[in-house]
Amino acid sequence: MKMDTGYDKMNIIFRIFCVYDEPSADLCLHKDLHLSNVHHLAVKRDGVQSIQIEQESACSIIYREETAGMLHIIFHIDVNSAYLSWTAVEQLKNGADVDIRTIPAIIGGDRESRHGIVLAKSPSAKKFGIRTGEPVVNAFRKCPNLHMDPPNHRMYREYSRRLMDFLKTYTPEIEQVSVDECYMDFTGIAQRFSSPVEAAYEIKARVYEKFGFTVNVGISTNKLLAKMASDFEKPNRVHTLFPEEVKEKMWPLPVSELFMAGKSSVAILEKLEIRTIGELAKTDPKLLEFHLKSHGRTLWEFANGIGDAKVQSEETAAKGVGNSTTLPKDVEKAEDAKKVLFSLAESVGKRLRKAGQKANMVSVEIRYSDFQNVSHQKQLGRASGADQVIYEAACSLFDELWNGKPIRLLGVRTAKLVDEDEPEQLSLFDLQFEVKSEKPKKSMEKLKKLSAAMGEIRGKYGADAVIRGSVLEQREKEKKYEKKQF
């Protein structure tokens, strides 16, 4: 089905629920679209409809109307080689003769010892085959005359703050996901511009004019596709990746370029002879779930362009409870990371109970040693404030997210909070078990009582009065590491 790409004419959005001959995706219809190629249209209950399209081998598509009115348009704004760009701008302000963005240059490590990893690189350095995340010593082997500056994270945070403050002059609907990237919900300000592309070019130009560094802007109907679009050709570019462009622009890419497709997942996919995003999109999701568990379904949805369109601004994010920690030493083993996650889950659970609240959603954040941030979230089966429930959800998310790289920071956050005494809506699955046995219900009650009791003991006698064996073991490791350092 051919569709006009004039998104200012968009009136109705439909989400495909089931496709018999083609993979599931978002389908966008315009108010002036002529349905001359629709073979059959049948209205069913709850607004669910079924159509057959002659041009697509009469494949059946079941969809539901999602929104009437303006389509959600999301921008992903990403600073090009942020650490190097910000360092270059600061050096030029202080009278430097050379712009390090124009020469082979990197940010990372110690200049004298040449230890550490490459955190950012210039386009010229990239031509020598230098990659972000590789050891600095390797970079110097590839380019002996390489210029290197150490990182200055205080300066990066200041430039990041200035950028976010500027973007908020357009709209407060900004979700910052790392020091150098954010999502913007363009929907509320669409009437001020002739098109999203025009707005993106204006933002990009004004950022350069005001600050002296460049950004890429990706545009789509959800955060996933906007993120993928901004990662296309760099620097200083605007790219679109609307649902009808996925097949042409995204499917030919290697599966390793799909968001959240880590090394271990890619290795499994390649064993299944799935090498492109398009091949992944056309694979039976049940097969992917068999090999990659729930992460397989997530990757299948991403390959088909299905993602979240909700931008979580600071105001929205504040309606949650979370905790994160920067680790004294990069963590390289999953078992060590999960001990940290347990400690964080305990902290979050304690704060929830103190506030008399339960959470319906848990999210996990990972920051790697190269300062790349990734995060993901999941709905709980029922609202909970129990440490163990939060911990198990966090571990599940961690297993989906972690790509094997050394970890510098871990965070656990809960959202969609409700009052602790709010009645619980049990699922059919829960009811089945409670009819046969009271064990699941009793188990949940025990978890709540245990968490509350531990919290009470710590409140009276201090945080270390009750410590899980796994947490104690992790602390002993950290103490040994600190002794070695001094």
Features from the language model and the residues they span:
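C-terminal hydrophobic structural anchor segments
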Residues: 396-449
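Short hydrophobic targeting helices and cationic amphipathic motifs
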Residues: 27-29, 33-35, 40-41
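Gly/Gly-Pro- and Ser/Thr-rich, intrinsically disordered tail segments characteristic of DNA damage-repair
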Residues: 16, 34, 52, 56-301, ...
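DNA-contacting surface of Y-family translesion DNA polymerases
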Residues: 64-69, 257, 265-407, 422
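Short, positively charged and aromatic/hydrophobic N-terminal segments
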Residues: 7-12, 16, 20, 37, ...
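A glycine-rich phosphate-binding loop feature that marks nucleotide/adenosyl-phosphate handling sites
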Residues: 221-224, 305, 358-369, 407-418, ...
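Alpha-helix boundary/capping motif
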Residues: 5-9, 21-23, 27, 31
